[in-house]
A protein has these predicted regions:
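Conserved ATP-binding/catalytic segment of the ANL
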Residues: 387-454, 471
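Structural core segment of the AMP-binding/adenylate-forming
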Residues: 2, 52-53, 80-152, 525-532
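Conserved AMP-binding/adenylate-forming core of the ANL superfamily
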Residues: 23-76, 93-98, 150, 195
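Conserved pre-ATP/AMP-binding loop-to-beta segment of ANL
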Residues: 19-21, 134, 155-180, 187, ...
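ANL superfamily adenylate-forming
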Residues: 117-172, 277-324
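Conserved AMP-binding A3 loop
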Residues: 33-37, 176-202
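Conserved AMP-binding/adenylation subdomain of ANL enzymes
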Residues: 199-216, 223-322, 332, 357
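Conserved C-terminal "lid"/linker of ANL adenylate-forming enzymes
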Residues: 452, 477-479, 527-585
Length: 585
């Protein structure tokens, strides 16, 4: 079990392992190692830079970057000098970037490239901002070149008594970071997390995961997301190795090259893997895959218990099908983790029948972030696992999950009233999620704020229905709507590569995506998908109308949060005319 008093203690362990490889980065097609002492030297170099800038204990220092080795170096350096890290998503607009920099009162700001630097230039005045550092080479007005700073790091790799003493000055209850929640509406709120919040959650959330020294993981989820950062800390704390991948599009090649033991992703990535696997299976290959899935289903209980079935048929299916899926993850993975949004029972069962237990967890930024998780020591499909021991949990009268403990955040930055609203009178944090506990395993039903109440007074939980729809390879995203209406409808953003393959096989031609979704054959196909899902729903939950949209929903186009959750209000506003058509208005 990890036992650190602060994140600085974690870094002290990370930085004193000599020549041991702790991180990897890609240059061209080659993956290069970063040793413990190299990381130590680089963090020292940035810490000295921050001190030369006059950054004091408690000052806020912001950071925006893709996943590259500079990210943890800056993060650990900020913590080393007792400052507070403020990570920003790369997808923020200049206006959003400016809001967070002003709201946090950032004194310094690190950006990765000219694109983010240009956003800063367009973000408006930030009165507190005094210094900017840029990772990439180039000419940037009034900014420090970080490559020049890192050149000095080689001379700082040996343990330094004064620097190590500086690390120890930070106390557990000091603020470590302010994480601005992406949110689906309004201005983001800054979640204040202390060192104690983070290290206590690390200590208990990783117990049962059996992370080993030398275990590798590819860091590709945005590190401004609390879960991605949490796992990186956990791997560093257990003497593992992190390979930083700046571009998600390069993930397939990275998995083959790095061969990670640990794979963390949001549900959408798992859905994409499933859709890609099913999309390649035609004719005899599909027959074999269906047979293998049948064998997996027959031996599901054994796989759930972490056993390898002894059946000759299962072993044959493993050789022909399951092993190839595992090879797509690099062939060495032994732990698959899903978080950030619900994975859905259908996807969980599909992977299980392919011989893979996906450990689904649950949490939020405000809980540092893990509330519960499945592990090798406790796994139940369809749940988000058992609670971390440093959190208590209770259910409100309406089923809302409420938690209390050392992982719960210190409050929202400069928003005392907003903080009060998130807690009960007796001090329990209201998660906003509906759930239930069964033999210690937590299940999430839906987001309280997303529950749909029809005009007939019936409640519909949209997420489970959306999960069932997305289990079909032709569905990219789905938004179930119907609040205050007589019945529920669904807007579907197709999985366009799969749809185009289907169209070619079924004699459908169209000049563009908009024309494709308006084709009668295509619409009939999606109506049949919805009809199949409707058969598993209560009468009041059934989707009466289907609307197809002619574009993919993405983070960049604004319909999804960085953790791939639907921005429902954005979708409702963007497609209000189409929704009116569905309701015959």
């Amino acid at each position: 079990m990890l036992d650190f008093g602060t994140l600085n203690d974690l870094f002290a362990r990370l930085g004193h392992r000599g020549d041991a490889t702790v991180a990897m980065w890609r240059e061209g097609t080659e993956w290069k190692p970063i040793s413990s002492k190299q990381m130590y030297g680089r963090v020292r170099a940035v810490a000295e830079l921050l001190q030369s800038w006059g950054v004091q204990r408690g000052d806020r220092v912001a950071l925006v970057s893709e996943n590259r080795w500079e990210w943890p170096v800056i993060d650990f350096a900020i913590l080393a000098v007792g400052a507070v890290g403020v990570p920003l998503y790369q997808t923020l607009t200049p206006e959003q970037m400016g809001y967070i920099l002003r709201d946090s009162g950032a004194k310094a700001f690190f950006v990765s490239d000219k694109k983010q630097y240009a956003k800063l230039s367009a973000a408006g005045e930030v009165p507190t901002l005094e210094h900017v550092g840029v990772f990439d080479t180039g000419e940037f007005d009034n900014a420090t070149s970080m490559p020049a700073v890192f050149e000095k790091a080689a001379s700082l790799e040996e343990p330094d008594t004064a620097f190590d003493a500086l690390l120890k000055q930070t106390k557990a209850d000091e603020l470590a970071t302010i994480v601005y929640t992406s949110g689906t509406t309004g201005d983001p709120k800054g979640v204040m997390l202390t060192h104690r919040n983070l290290v206590d959650n690390l200590r208990f959330s990783t117990d049962g995961l059996h992370i080993k020294a030398g275990d590798k993981s590819i860091s590709f989820l945005p590190l401004s997301h609390a879960l991605a950062r949490h796992l990186d800390y956990a791997i560093y704390g257990n003497d593992g190795v992190i390979a930083y991948l700046p571009k998600f599009d390069d993930l397939v090649g990275a998995m083959k090259a790095v061969r990670p033991e640990i794979f963390l992703a949001v549900p959408r990535v798992y859905e994409k893997v499933r859709q890609g696997t099913e999309g390649k299976a035609h004719g005899f290959k599909k027959t074999i895959m269906d047979w293998a899935l049948g064998q997996g289903k027959a031996h599901r209980t054994e796989v759930m218990e972490g056993k390898t079935p002894g059946s000759l048929f299962w072993k044959l299916a493993n050789k022909l099908v399951y092993s190839r899926l595992k090879e797509a993850f690099g062939g060495h993975a032994r732990m698959w983790i899903s978080g950030g949004a619900p994975l859905g029972m259908d996807s969980s069962e599909w992977f299980l029948d392919m011989g893979i237990r996906v450990f689904e967890g649950y949490g939020m930024t405000e809980t540092s972030p893990v509330i519960s998780r499945n592990t090798f020591d406790g796994y139940r499909i369809g749940t988000v696992g058992k609670l971390v021991p440093n959190l208590e949990c209770r259910m409100a009268a309406d089923g809302e999950i409420e938690v209390k403990g050392t992982a719960v955040f210190a409050g929202y930055w400069q928003k005392e009233e907003a903080t009060k609203k998130e807690f009960t009178d007796d001090g329990w944090f209201k998660t906003g999620d509906i759930g239930k506990l069964d033999e210690g395993f937590l299940s999430i039903t839906d987001r309280k704020k997303e529950l749909i109440k029809t005009s007939g007074g019936k409640y519909i939980a949209p997420q489970p229905i959306e999960g069932k729809l997305k289990a079909d390879g032709l569905v990219g995203q789905a938004a179930v709507l119907g609040d205050t209406q007589k019945f529920a409808v669904v807007l579907i953003s197709p999985e366009f590569p799969a749809l185009k393959r289907w169209a070619a096989q079924n004699g459908v031609t169209a000049k563009d995506d908009a024309a494709l979704v308006n084709d009668p054959k295509v619409q009939a196909q999606y109506e049949s998908i919805v009809k199949k899902v409707n058969a598993s729903l209560e009468h009041h939950e059934t989707l009466k109308k289907v609307g197809l949209v002619g574009e993919e929903w993405t983070v960049d186009s604004g319909e999804l949060t960085p953790s791939m959750k639907l921005k429902r209000r954005v979708i409702v506003e963007k497609y209000k005319d189409k929704i009116k058509e569905l309701y015959g208005e």
